[in-house]
Each structure stands twice: as C-alpha cells, then as structure tokens.
C-alpha cells in the first residue's frame, strides 16, 4: 500500500473516536440514519489525512454527498469549521496544512481532547 493511501484512509480506531465525539449523528443535519464517520473535512483528493480525527466527521449519505459534490461546499465547510473548532478548542488547527499528507513525514494516530456536547 502506498504511504499516502495509508495515511488518507480512515482507520477503525479513528472511526470509533469520531463516532463517539459526534454522538452517532450527522454533524450537519442531526439525523442518525445512514450516518458513518467517514467524511473528510479536507478531502482525500486534496491529501486530507484519515488518521487525524480532527479531519473526519460523521455525515449522513445526503450531507456527505452535498459536501463533496455541490456548490454549497463552501457554506458547509464554514459550518464544519465552526463545529470542529468548538469541539477541539485549543487543539483545533491553525493551518489546514496540518490536516494534509506531506511526503516524507511520519504520522501516527493521536487522540485529541474535545469538548463534550
């Protein structure tokens, strides 16, 4: 497996952590139907890390599709930024590059403190 693929895929441990953080609900519409913790804030196509829980969120199929494929992406991303920065506070990113794969770097799965809610 290519190193980039390894780091952009979402490991089970990250999915479990994100599911718990988001309460098993779509963070955009609140539904519990068709929800999974497999949506990237920074998409895989832009080298978004899957091993960093701060880059992953729970979304239903509808909202995930809207985020990935609609002109509403910018507005949805603004909402996600608000949600994730609220959840992580000081552990939120200062630059989106923190959530992207960079060739030659070694990455590990980390757990970040987040606010309950």
Task: Mark where each language-model region is.
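Short cysteine-rich loop/turn motifs with clustered Cys
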Residues: 9-37, 60-62
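Short recognition patches in nucleic-acid-associated and regulatory proteins
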Residues: 35-46
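Polybasic, low-complexity binding patches
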Residues: 2-7, 45-57, 65-117
């Amino acid at each position: 497996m290519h190193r980039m693929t390894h780091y952009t895929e979402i490991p089970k441990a990250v999915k479990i952590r994100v599911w718990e953080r988001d309460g098993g609900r779509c963070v955009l519409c609140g539904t519990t139907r068709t929800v999974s913790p497999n949506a990237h804030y920074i998409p895989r196509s832009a080298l978004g890390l899957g091993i960093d829980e701060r880059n992953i969120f729970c979304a239903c199929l509808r909202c995930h599709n809207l985020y990935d494929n609609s002109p509403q992406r910018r507005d949805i991303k603004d909402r996600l930024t608000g949600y994730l920065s609220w959840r992580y506070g000081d552990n939120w990113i200062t630059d989106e590059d923190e959530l992207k794969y960079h060739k030659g770097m070694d990455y590990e799965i980390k757990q970040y403190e987040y606010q309950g809610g």
